[in-house]
């Protein structure tokens, strides 16, 4: 059984969010939550929110045991960029990209599924 949770249009660049995603991929659910709780990165707070949602989905929808869950997949995809302009000298303007990303976290129980 694999359960997913998504956060779309998160206001952080995908490059920065992937640094945190690489740390929690493959860990147990409780261990991943503890790691994210003490991280001082902005992406860690967003990732913790999505991970807690995935754990709650597994518990409520599938009746899964929290102690058996592990983080099976963490994907961080680029979202659309908002464009802002910064005024420069002589009437010129530079473009500023406010990047977004989509964070997907999947948790699964430790047991191997037989099809």
Curated annotation (Swiss-Prot):
A biological-process GO annotation: translation
CDD domains listed in its UniProt record: Ribosomal_L22
GO molecular function: rRNA binding; structural constituent of ribosome
Record has rRNA-binding as a keyword: yes
Cellular component, GO annotation: cytosolic large ribosomal subunit
Pfam families linked: Ribosomal_L22
Protein family per UniProt: Belongs to the universal ribosomal protein uL22 family.
Quaternary structure annotation from Swiss-Prot or TrEMBL: Part of the 50S ribosomal subunit.
Function: This protein binds specifically to 23S rRNA; its binding is stimulated by other ribosomal proteins, e.g. L4, L17, and L20. It is important during the early stages of 50S assembly. It makes multiple contacts with different domains of the 23S rRNA in the assembled 50S subunit and ribosome. The globular domain of the protein is located near the polypeptide exit tunnel on the outside of the subunit, while an extended beta-hairpin is found that lines the wall of the exit tunnel in the center of the 70S ribosome.
Protein name: Large ribosomal subunit protein uL22
Organism: Coxiella burnetii (strain CbuK_Q154)
Classification lineage: Bacteria, Pseudomonadati, Pseudomonadota, Gammaproteobacteria, Legionellales
């Amino acid at each position: 059984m694999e359960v997913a949770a998504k956060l779309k249009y998160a206001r952080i660049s995908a490059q920065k969010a992937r640094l945190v995603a690489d740390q929690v991929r493959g860990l147990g659910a409780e261990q991943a939550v503890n790691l994210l709780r003490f991280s001082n990165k902005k992406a860690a707070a967003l990732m913790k929110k999505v991970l807690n949602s995935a754990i709650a989905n597994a518990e409520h929808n599938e009746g899964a045991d929290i102690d058996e869950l592990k983080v099976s997949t963490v994907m961080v995809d680029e979202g659309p960029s908002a464009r802002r302009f910064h005024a420069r000298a002589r009437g010129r303007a530079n473009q500023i990209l406010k990047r977004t990303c989509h964070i997907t976290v999947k948790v699964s129980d430790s047991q191997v599924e037989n099809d």
